Design a protein with these regions (language model features):
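N-terminal cap/leader regions of alpha/beta-hydrolase-fold enzymes
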Residues: 1-224
Length: 224
């Protein structure tokens, strides 16, 4: 990793928000924007940004809560529950746009987790010129209203034993996307719980390794 550390970004509405940037020593030409889970810019996502940089990605992980909680990283003591209901898809898209503007030109992908997974998928229907959108265990309901508008490839990495969303909802989403002719891939990890990649990595090493490989393959294939 050539460089990494916290940065302060400004969204389109003038809001300052926290982010974490990691730059590769050997760039692949690809960019990644990380959308965290409900905890916001938890230290896990700073470490993940560095991991993407090690794989050649210019990477920025964003925080959601600049408008309601100010700036700074979010450790385990952060009370995200009072802030998460105030986060809107429009604000997330604007914040991601500010993150993209920080990166060099090149194919840019989003990857999100839980709450961020759904928002990452939604970006595939938005105005940002992304090469693809990746999401771990996002809720299908978060993208139900934009399915016809999806224009960019999706990678969906699903926990087979997700406590938040029954498996049949993901299977229904997979069928609906196929009916609409949308470019998507869905992998369901049997038995894996919600947050298996970001909170249960040690117990689900094989699933996490497979998901990482799929991300690298997906981004290589869609980098253009």
């Amino acid at each position: 990793v050539a460089d990494h550390g916290p940065v302060l970004l400004t969204s389109a509405d003038g809001t300052a928000f926290s982010a974490y940037r990691a730059l590769p020593a050997e760039p692949s030409g690809r960019n990644m924007v990380i959308l965290p889970d409900i905890r916001g810019l938890h230290p896990f996502y700073a470490a993940l940004a560095q991991r993407f940089a090690e794989a050649g990605f210019r990477t920025v992980a964003i925080d959601y809560f600049g408008r309601t909680a100010g700036t700074g990283s979010r450790d385990d003591g952060f009370d995200w529950q009072q802030h998460i209901p105030k986060v809107t898809p429009g604000n997330v898209a604007a914040d991601v746009a500010a993150a993209v503007a920080l990166l060099d030109r090149g194919p840019t992908f989003s990857v999100g987790f839980c709450f961020g997974g759904g928002h990452s998928w939604r970006l595939a229907a938005g105005e940002l010129d992304l090469a693809g959108s990746i999401g771990f265990y996002g809720r299908p309901a978060m993208i139900a209203d934009v399915l016809p508008d999806l224009r960019r490839p999706l990678l969906m990495l699903v926990a087979g034993a997700d406590q938040a969303t029954p498996r049949d909802e993901f299977e229904g989403l997979d069928r609906r996307l196929s009916e609409l002719g949308k470019d998507h891939e869905m992998t369901i990890y049997d038995g894996a719980p919600h947050s298996f990649f970001d909170r249960s990595y040690a117990q689900w090493k094989d699933a996490c390794a497979d998901a990482w490989r799929r991300i690298l393959d997906f981004t290589a294939r869609h980098a253009g």
